[in-house]
Amino acid sequence: MDDNPTAVKLDQGGNQAPQGQGRRRLPKALGYITGDMKEFANWLKDKPQALQFVDWVLRGISQVVFVSNPISGILILVGLLVQNPWCALNGCVGTVVSTLTALLLNQDRSAITAGLQGYNATLVGILMAIYSDKGNYFWWLLFPVSAMSMTCPIFSSALNSVLSKWDLPVFTLPFNMALSMYLSATGHYNPFFPSTLVTPVTSVPNVTWPDLSALQLLKSLPVGVGQIYGCDNPWAGGIFLGAILLSSPLMCLHAAIGSLLGIIAGLSLSAPFENIYAGLWGFNSSLACIAIGGMFMALTWQTHLLALACALFTAYLGASMSHVMAVVGLPSCTWPFCLATLLFLLLTTKNPNIYKMPISKVTYPEENRIFYLQSTKRTVQGPL
């Protein structure tokens, strides 16, 4: 998977220099807006605090899909506006409040600047708006959204104290805890903040295989990615894929593969087609596939196959947890992704090609692979 760098030879007259520079100029320019935009973050350090804060919020919005890129954050915000401006507003409010709370609590500044103190609250705001039985533009909802967003840095800090002992990320566990707590406290019959009624399946679904639509299945692939943010609009899902692609093509590939495997898992269990079309089988497996396929494990053929296995396992676990949690009137959220991926990250093996990235070194898959190759090279050369 490694390519040897090629050298550009210049003649004595220097006629080839401008041409060589032209070839390098475009990749260099792309380097400033792809990946984690590290150069931009460094440039912002001596700029006004308000401008830095906007960068942190945008990175927080994109960190839901493991991306720390403000341009990706803008694209994702556009996708949310395409889906529902009210959900976009609640997501932004949640991210802003959570980031401010983290600053007030003096949390690790590098985590704040990378957006790691905002992404859980992004989901909290969006999903609280989606599960509100009052519909769109129920402005009083902004108060509980702000309150629950304040809990996210607290949950994150507490969970990190435990999970850091095993060098594990907190993922979206704070979001799951905050949303489950809110929906449990309010419920469908709350007079102030009623939530959508979640009930278990009580009858055999009517699945007619001849009615299966290939076009709808194709659309469900981007919709599965869109459902990471609670969006069922294929255009929104396509924009999210574009935002991921801007940061990392490898992440985009695994996001799409994970969504596809979720569709396959749903079909294998004869799930209702409308659930598959709505992307409900794809979002957890998409996140799991990204996490194992190069993000928290260095990408090799072995970890790629492990990512596929994790995506399938996550989809089936999601079906199981949906049935169990519906009994108490709660959605499964991203609990399946968190539990399944943490389980796979705890895997121990003597295979050197299955390499779990140190949390402090995690950036994005392409950079993670470079770190892995350099570490492997140092290990081989060490005894010499």
Curated annotation (Swiss-Prot):
It is found in: Cell membrane; Basolateral cell membrane. The keyword Membrane applies. Gene3D superfamilies: Ammonium transporter AmtB like domains. Keywords: Cell membrane, Glycoprotein, Membrane, Transmembrane, Transmembrane helix, Transport. It is a multi-pass membrane protein. It holds the Pfam family UT. Glycans are attached at N206. It catalyses: urea(in) = urea(out). The record marks T334 as: Important for channel permeability. Residues 1-23 are annotated as: Disordered. GO terms for cellular component: basolateral plasma membrane; plasma membrane. One of its GO terms (molecular function) is urea channel activity. It comes from the Eukaryota. The chain crosses the membrane at residues 61-81, 85-105, 111-131, 138-158, 168-188, 237-257, 279-299, 327-347. Belongs to the urea transporter family. Homotrimer; each subunit contains a pore through which urea permeates. Identified in a complex with STOM. Mediates the transport of urea driven by a concentration gradient across the cell membranes of erythrocytes and the renal inner medullary collecting duct which is critical to the urinary concentrating mechanism. Facilitates water transport in erythrocytes. PANTHER family: UREA TRANSPORTER (PTHR10464), UREA TRANSPORTER 1 (PTHR10464:SF5). This is Urea transporter 1.
